[in-house]
Every structure is written in structure tokens, then in C-alpha cells.
Amino acid sequence: MGDADFVRETIQSLNSHAAELGSMYREVMASVKNRTEIPNVKDIFKEMAEASRECDEMLEIYYGDEDPLTPDVRRAIQRVQDQLSNCASAFVAYMAIARLTLG
């Protein structure tokens, strides 16, 4: 596999993680709004861990390399990081609502 193929597959994989996390974020926020349980919490945490790990692997591959991350790869990593942050914020909102509801 050439460098261009590797970059293309990396971007596609990162974009897939970002899309999946975006969908999961909406699910958690729907649970916040409706004050219902999060239906697939283990799957969400698993996806968050996998996405984070893939970003870490990309940074390790390119760290100190003479060819730095391409702008497209950087943007794909940023999309994943944004969605990870969104999911974490949604869980904070969920826990805040749960505390108010139970208390």
C-alpha cells in the first residue's frame, strides 16, 4: 500500500469514527432531553476508546517523521476529537440531569 492509499484509508476510517460518534452524541442528548436511560452506553464508550486510540496511533506514526501529517489527516483527527468532546459533554449533561431527577 502506498502513502496515498494509507492516507486515504486513514482519513476514511477517522471520518467513520467521527460520524459514529456524532450519531452516539445525538442518542445521548436525546436521553438527556427525554430523561431516559442511554440504551447502548457500553457501545458508546467502546467507540470513544477506539476512536481515541486510532488518533493516538496516527500521531505516533507521524511523530518525528520528516513528512508531517497532511492537512486532511489533521482535519480528520480534529473531527474525531470534536466528537469525542461532544460525547463527553453529553455524558456530563446526562449525569447532571440524573442527579437532579433522582435527588
Question: What are the functions of these language-model segments?
Answer:
Residues 2-103:
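Long, low-complexity or tandemly repetitive, helically biased scaffold regions used
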